[in-house]
Amino acid sequence: MTASVVAEATEVTRVIPHRFPVLLVDQVTEVVTGHHLSARKAVSANEPCYGHLGPDQPASELEYPSMLLVESWGQAAVLLAAWDHPTSDVRSGRIDLAGAIERVRFLRPVRPGSVLEHRVRMVRAVGDTAILAGETLVGGETVMEIGHFVVALRPVADLVPGGTVSTGTDGGR
């Protein structure tokens, strides 16, 4: 069965502030607000992480970096936590802060050509803080499990002295 697409990358960027080359979610295929979300990321040999490799690299060097696998799943988790409260601009509104992650297990390598299927479940939400869990699959096989991931959605004004964020055009003032 093929999952229908709920949101493409352009819609994803309306919910979270990530942009290329840091946006690591291509599609949201299912979302039940406050409960669960499924998202996809296609891993390509054109990813920036492979830019330094030559044409004759051993397969082990083509493994998708585990930190990017976690980041991609984490972006899907933030999408679930923030779905009803989009934050596409980190200079205003709220910012998504990763607080903790535990019980991460990598079960098999991911290589270019793989399509990651992130499954995220809301374990608990308290105010603007969410605890999430889930896994990533490739071809129906689990490649990574996340026991708990904590994300906090905080007003930018609470995090920046004076409550304003530089746009980069004012010399940092």
Placement of each model-derived feature along the sequence:
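HotDog/MaoC-like acyl-thioester-processing domains
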Residues: 2-5, 110-173
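Hydrophobic beta-strand-centered segment that forms part of the acyl-chain substrate-binding groove
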Residues: 3-6, 77-117, 144-146, 151
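Conserved positions in beta-strands of structured domains
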Residues: 26-29, 102, 107, 121-123, ...
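Catalytic strand-loop segment that frames the active site of acyl-thioester-processing enzymes
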Residues: 20-64
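Compact, glycine-rich, soluble single-domain proteins
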Residues: 54-80, 98
